[in-house]
Amino acid sequence: SLAVACVLALGNISDRMEKGLSQQSREFMAGDRSLQSSRAVPKAWIDEARQRGLKVGEQLTFATMTFARDTPQLANVKAVDDVYPMYGTLQTNPPGLKPQPGSVLLAPRLMALLNLKIGDSIDVGDATLRIAGEVVQEPDSGFNPFQIAPRLMMNMADVEKTAAVQPGSRVTWRYKFGGTPQQLEAYEKWLLPQLKPEQRWYGLEQDEGALGKSLERSQQFLL
């Protein structure tokens, strides 16, 4: 009947929309799930995830002073590994760049504040790194009204050279996980009993930011 056909059609549309939202949520997070911690998690946790077939990426964010020809400027540093971004696109100028060892990507505002151009060098802590380009948009940047300092992106391999991260430093580790729903669910059951109170395992649905709340409302509408 017409009523049955309409219900089936609406169901198909709802399924397609939900799949589209799921794909977008992956890109907004640059992963299917995130693990956030104020310190590096045990290597065994990452090894276990990879043994279960999950793809894992690591990020570290912290604030530190940068210098260009003795001019200081606080920067919000995001160090990433070669997996980044697991999903989504890092928009840069010139296009197609990723943070490579020995080089950095700067937000246009940081470039302007320090009067720098692509190809110049910048001191990040004890390390002198070459500016390969500008960060235009990060897939997982979200919206953080408290992030006052402009972004500087670097490769995880260069963090130790900066000496900016010491015991007691305020840092945030984020581990991004990608895999099938079954792989993620099995790993979650293994991981959750081991988490400390300051550690958080979440998908975009559990994210407290605006994107997470928007996705939750969209899913409720589809249901």
Predicted regions span which residues?
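Membrane transport/envelope proteins' first extracytoplasmic loop
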Residues: 1-223
